Amino acid sequence: MAAHVSTGNIHNFYLAGQVYRGQAFSWSSASTFMANPFKEPSWSSGVFKALKAERCGCYSRGISPISETSKPIRAVSVSSSTKYYDFTVIGSGVAGLRYALEVAKQGTVAVITKDEPHESNTNYAQGGVSAVLCPLDSVESHMRDTMVAGAHLCDEETVRVVCTEGPERIRELIAMGASFDHGEDGNLHLAREGGHSHCRIVHAADMTGREIERALLEAVLNDPNISVFKHHFAIDLLTSQDGLNTVCHGVDTLNIKTNEVVRFISKVTLLASGGAGHIYPSTTNPLVATGDGMAMAHRAQAVISNMEFVQFHPTALADEGLPIKLQTARENAFLITEAVRGDGGILYNLGMERFMPVYDERAELAPRDVVARSIDDQLKKRNEKYVLLDISHKPREKILAHFPNIASECLKHGLDITRQPIPVVPAAHYMCGGVRAGLQGETNVLGLFVAGEVACTGLHGANRLASNSLLEALVFARRAVQPSTELMKRTRLDVCASEKWTRPVVATARLLGDEVIAKIIALTKEVRRELQEVMWKYVGIVRSTIRLTTAERKIAELEAKWETFLFEHGWEQTVVALEACEMRNLFCCAKLVVSSALARHESRGLHYMTDFPFVEESKRIPTIILPSSPTTASWSSRRLQNISSSSLIDC
């Protein structure tokens, strides 16, 4: 487990069972807090100034990796196994691509993606992007909706920034060729979704993410300063220590097609690798969402926050309720967008009783956490497998125009959504927590920026408002550009730097033998399923201290069993393989979620505890996980490479 889990705000925070009181806090080392009674910061202006100043030198300290102004470098390959770029971007969703297009104006960019470039959470996003574009709407209204949905754990400054800058980010997408739906008056058609008090969802039917991904990816592939490396799995970040400062210099990757390790050395790294939906057995996320970025950042000494807040989307398609059953199980659950309820969809149990008004006066338009818990309660009380979402009372042409993708998918399996209700069930959807970031995407690791689902910016609080995810990714990807380019211009790289870290070794038949590799892969698949079942059973929509401590114990036992098998069969600290590296990241993220959940003794937003069923004002504070100790951690929590303490500016 993480070495330290704590919660903190401007009034008090909790660390290792002790309570400290003050008005602010900052870091004095990698594992302790210091209280400062003289300032009263918000999430962004205070806590992140502490992160930025104490851990990152405010991007102006004369620490070793920062030098006088340097020129952008050309993309250099010292060998096929080492590449040098000004910027490395890990992830090819909306955050990574939008950032890459901007920083490419200043230098060379490597975009590293685990699968095909389009295979990201962005590509699966159906609903849209929320933005204040209607004269009847206002930034204040969008802010209020965001903070109410987030159970008032959101940072107000972050919320204001995102809601204010959102409309301009939409206009930029349109200028880049993204095509969104328009109404009969020629203006953008703005939909409404749960938790929103106004129509403000910009969308492209029910395939908004796919359209945004198309436009951005087309621009990226045509940019001469950007190189896209597909099928490259990010293993671990490359870091060095300068006093108390951790500095990021790039990333090691595994070329999945050639089974070779490729090292990327860069002046700036953006982590935009998405979420960790596959710690659960049913998720709307694609197979690539195994928490790689969050786990890598944690191992690299980045601060992690609010991991207990896992959003379960209330309405994923329940395949067992379809007239024509699937021949093989899906790799990820098919999402039924929030917009169906926003357009008037009604939820019924299998007895055709409408139930949402019983739980919340907002009924089907309540925030996702409320709707998911309500459905979960119905399923448990009635011992049923799914509920029904009915939109068939709306005009057929309107349904098919707004939800063509959903209609087509359901029709494949014998269900006509214009006449029949849709069977739905909650599924893991979005991580509201992640790598703690400031208003410019900065982290406590110098040279490492984050954007998108991998980040915890303070926007979502305890529950994300529908269609705020793509919005956040766009805003923070753009805000990270200026500090990134400034840092790039002040940073020089050693062309010999690649050899300053131990290189990972690929698990091959020559190294371990075919039989051993087959056994390891088989066990890893089995352990992955077991971990997912533990997370769903004990760390799902409704939790308790007993369930969480049970999960903690079972995960530790499962991880020990898996790691023991590996290392008894010739595995070593630096050995890598795709299945094993994904498993280590899933273990790491699962432990972060459980640790955070155990630290929050209240029910707030997505975190509902049966033994702490009420919101407590004194606990309206973020959960913080400090870096773990590499000497006592399991393999999933240790970096593969030895950290170099030497300067990387020898040239």
Curated annotation (Swiss-Prot):
One of its GO terms (biological process) is NAD biosynthetic process. Residues 1-74 form a transit peptide. Keywords: Chloroplast, FAD, Flavoprotein, Nucleotide-binding, Oxidoreductase, Plastid, Pyridine nucleotide biosynthesis, Transit peptide. It is found in: Plastid, Chloroplast. GO terms for molecular function: L-aspartate oxidase activity; nucleotide binding. FAD binds at residues 92-95, 114, 121-128, 292, 453, 469-470. Pathway: Cofactor biosynthesis; NAD(+) biosynthesis; iminoaspartate from L-aspartate (oxidase route): step 1/1. InterPro entries: FAD-dep_OxRdtase_2_FAD-bd, FAD/NAD-bd_sf, Fum_R/Succ_DH_flav-like_C_sf, Fum_Rdtase/Succ_DH_flav-like_C, NadB, Succ_DH/fumarate_Rdtase_cat_sf. GO terms for cellular component: chloroplast. Binds 1 FAD per subunit. It catalyses: L-aspartate + O2 = iminosuccinate + H2O2. SUPFAM superfamilies: FAD/NAD(P)-binding domain, Succinate dehydrogenase/fumarate reductase flavoprotein C-terminal domain, Succinate dehydrogenase/fumarate reductase flavoprotein, catalytic domain. Disruption phenotype: Embryonic lethality when homozygous. Interacts in vitro with QS. The viable mutant fin4 (T-DNA insertion in the promoter) is impaired in the RBOHD-dependent pathogen-associated molecular pattern (PAMP)-induced reactive oxygen species (ROS) burst and stomatal closure. This is L-aspartate oxidase, chloroplastic. It comes from Arabidopsis thaliana. The lineage of its organism: Eukaryota, Viridiplantae, Streptophyta, Embryophyta, Tracheophyta.
